[in-house]
Amino acid sequence: YNIAPMNPPVSTVELTGGEIKEMLEENLERSFSCNPLGQMGGYVKRCLGLQVNLRIENPKGHRIQEIYYKGRHIDFEKTYKVSFVTTQGVASKYGKNRKKYDINAVEAMKDYLKENSNFAPGNKESFRLV
């Protein structure tokens, strides 16, 4: 349970594909900024269900080359319902229709692993350098 040591509640929010890209680009800039003062956090967001092809060396706003959801390019105009824990997962400036649930992260993770017993952390490529 080291990934969610405080065991926060699970929340959902509706994000457009464009917001997903903007949020991930912002996160990549805060992790890989050429300006050391722009580096805030030092980690790439963890996600399951997306595959992001990126070029770390590209300038701010141009690192993400492609984003796939369920094997298809995301539609920047379409709205997707996503789950997350804490506003570090999805900042409050993104999305609409936020909802906090009565289930906490550890319980949700246990339920997910029961339903997906073949899941292994190493078998998902969320972020891929191209």
Map each language-model feature to its residues.
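Feature captures C-terminal
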Residues: 1-130
